[in-house]
Amino acid sequence: MRVHRLPENFSLERARRAQLAIARMVLEEDSLPESVRRAAGVDVAFKGDYAFAAAVVVEYPSFSVVDYSVTRTEVRFPYVPTLLAFREVWPAYTALKRLKSEPDVLLVDGNGRLHPFKAGFACHLGVLVDKPTIGVAKKLLVGEVGSWKSGVAPVLYRGEVLGMAVKTSERSKPVFVSIGHKISLNTAVWIVRMFTKRGLRLPEPLRLAHLYATAYARGNMEEKDFYLDEPS
């Protein structure tokens, strides 16, 4: 396994400028159909030199899987905190473009606005595909959790509410929900709750995307279901 190094033309200044540009492009208003029925969960797993991205479309209220894809791409960017979008957005995009059905909204494993530069993975992917997108993180990246009310608490960073901590069940740890693109924070929380099965922590599309991506990375799914998609 080779060590993944930063691209030769990389500069932190350019990366930050790109993040700020993405942050300016994010829309924080709802752009959804009247009836939201299909959500795609997006997650990326890594093993060796490859990224395994899964996109799983789940239909509400049955929670049935109506479409999914998993792609394998070569890792082109190392792990750099606050720059995860540069590592994950291409694999995620390749999985999304394989889908045959059109989801109403994307649920992404990672942060959106809840990011030091207001431009996490969910923002990058949402702007790239121009779809309503929600960031759902399992750990708090930045900010402080405020007072809880009805299982929800604001997450403040530098005096601004950038996300919401959401307890999807009484016994589970919270998830941290933030705007990715073309959605309001209140609607994002509502959709996360809507697509979460009773007693579980993660919304079903995202829970399944994590399982699918991990299974492919470990070689636990059939070869005939595997899509190989390398950048040209």
Curated annotation (Swiss-Prot):
Q: Tell me where on the tree of life, at the top rank, the source sits.
A: Archaea
Q: What class of enzyme is it?
A: hydrolase
Keyword Magnesium listed? The answer is yes
Places the protein is found: Cytoplasm
Q: What does the record give as the reaction this protein catalyses?
A: Endonucleolytic cleavage at apurinic or apyrimidinic sites to products with a 5'-phosphate
Q: Cofactors per UniProt?
A: Mg(2+)
Sites where the protein binds Mg(2+): 43, 109
GO annotation (BP), single: DNA repair
InterPro entries reported in the protein's UniProt record: Endonuclease-V
Its keywords, alphabetically, are: Cytoplasm, DNA damage, DNA repair, Endonuclease, Hydrolase, Magnesium, Metal-binding, Nuclease
Query: EC annotation?
Result: 3.1.21.7
Question: Gene Ontology cellular component?
Answer: cytoplasm
Checking Pfam families in the record gives: Endonuclease_5 (PF04493)
The UniProt site entry described as Interaction with target DNA is assigned to 79
Give one GO term, molecular function aspect. Answer: RNA endonuclease activity, producing 5'-phosphomonoesters
Hey, which family's this protein in? Belongs to the endonuclease V family.
Describe the task this protein carries out. Answer: DNA repair enzyme involved in the repair of deaminated bases. Selectively cleaves double-stranded DNA at the second phosphodiester bond 3' to a deoxyinosine leaving behind the intact lesion on the nicked DNA.
Q: What is this protein called?
A: Endonuclease V
**Highest classification ranks of the organism:** Archaea, Thermoproteota, Thermoprotei, Thermofilales, Thermofilaceae
